[in-house]
Every structure is written in structure tokens, then in C-alpha cells.
Amino acid sequence: MSLHGILASAGTIGAVAAWLMSYKPALFGFLFLLLLLSNWLVKYEHKLTLPEPQQDEILQRLLFSEMKMKVLENQMFIIWNKMNHHGRSSRHRNFPMKKHRMRRHESICPTLSDCTSSSPS
């Protein structure tokens, strides 16, 4: 199977690519249009650029905002870690108390079962 067959079987984009490859003048024209479009976009972007002092001021504001975001992110991580650590420590405190309660119930249950099982005959 040739490259054209593989591209044509790949779908719509593959069929268009195969057609462009078979028609070299059309491919050349398409690439030339892309080149003109990119040149126009670069010229248009150059007209939209701000003067140097305004760009510097905007850059400083962006950097300052990014620094504030980093500080807030670090504070959130600190709070998150404290909450997780507090949750783990409270779970560890409650867990032995549950065991202690179970032991207390176990110690009561045998005496109750002894009392109920020993019925007068």
C-alpha cells in the first residue's frame, strides 16, 4: 500500500493530505497562503504591542500576582496538612478509646452471661 492509500484511508484529513500531495501546485499554493497569513499575523501583532514602560508595568503586576498566588497556595497546603494531621491524631485518640470500651463491654458480658446461664434448678 502506498503513502497516498494510507493517508486516504486515515479519514478526511488524510484524504485532504493525499490530495494535496498528488497536486503539488495546490500544495505549494496552500503553503504560500499559510506563509502570507503568518507574515500578516506577525505584522499585526507588532502593531498591537505596547510601549516598553507599559509592558514593564504589566509584567511587574503579573509577577506580583503570581507571587501572591504562590503564598496563598503555600498557606492552603499548610492548612491542608494541619487538617490531615489533626484528623489522623484524633482518629488515633478515638481508636484506643473504642478498644477500651470494647474491653469494658467484654468484661461486663461474661458476668451477665454467667448470671443468666446459671439459673436455679
Curated annotation (Swiss-Prot):
The keyword Membrane applies. Keywords: Fertilization, Membrane, Signal, Transmembrane, Transmembrane helix. Testis-specific. It comes from the Eukaryota. It is a single-pass membrane protein. GO terms for biological process: single fertilization. Pfam families: DUF5531. Residues 1-17 form the signal peptide. The chain crosses the membrane at residues 18-36. One of its GO terms (cellular component) is membrane. The keyword Transcription does not apply. It is found in: Membrane. InterPro entries: TEX46-like (IPR038788). Essential for male fertility, sperm head formation and sperm penetration through the egg zona pellucida. PANTHER family: TESTIS-EXPRESSED PROTEIN 46. This is Testis-expressed protein 46.
